[in-house]
Amino acid sequence: MRTYVSPIGYNSTSVVRPVLSRGLDSGDEIRLLRPHEESDGQRATEAIGDVERLLNEIEPDVTLTVEWITYDDYAAAVLECSEIIIGADGDVIVNLGGGARDILVPLTTAALVHSEAIATMVTFSDIDGAVRELESPMITASVPENVVSTLEAVADHVDRVSTPTLTEELDRSKSSITRHVNLLEEEGLVQTEKHGRTKVVELTFAGELYLRIDGNC
């Protein structure tokens, strides 16, 4: 099953299109985030009704829930969004588009913190109406300083680099480099693949961000 988490404003399309792009099956859940107070409740209610009607035409056995989020306290809103994400069942799909910015910003923060719990992040473009999948960086990753030097060496290469090359450049044992690369991959900072019997390593988006946070980029 899937649980979709999405803000909703007055436009049902920003919710419906991302859901349809990922699929909808019996037992799936839709959790729509709204501010706990709003100036035009009627328009919001109409948008929620449109979502429910359109999705029920496709799959009647879908649960739709409205979650009320604090809009005037950023920290409280982040924690509320956090609870929704970690309490969701199945594959969690977070839509970072639509709705009030007062809800979207806290949801984005919570989604980045809990990226390991999210199967997919998507967004609905206000410009061209396209639904795009977003790469979710593991911003909570943490590795020892001696392993960071291996990450830096990977980043020094524009393209992929082989583990034998890293062993030579860093003047370390093959077993040490293998351990470092395995740890970095577990943290989502690099990705690897085999070319024959040789493993090649490539920096990920999360790895690039990690080095910027760490002050090494």
Language-model features, listed with the residues they occupy:
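Long, low-complexity, Lys/Arg-enriched
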Residues: M1-D91, P106, L112-C217
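Short glycine-rich phosphate-binding loop at a beta-alpha junction
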Residues: D91-G97
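The conserved phosphate-sensing helix
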Residues: G99-L104
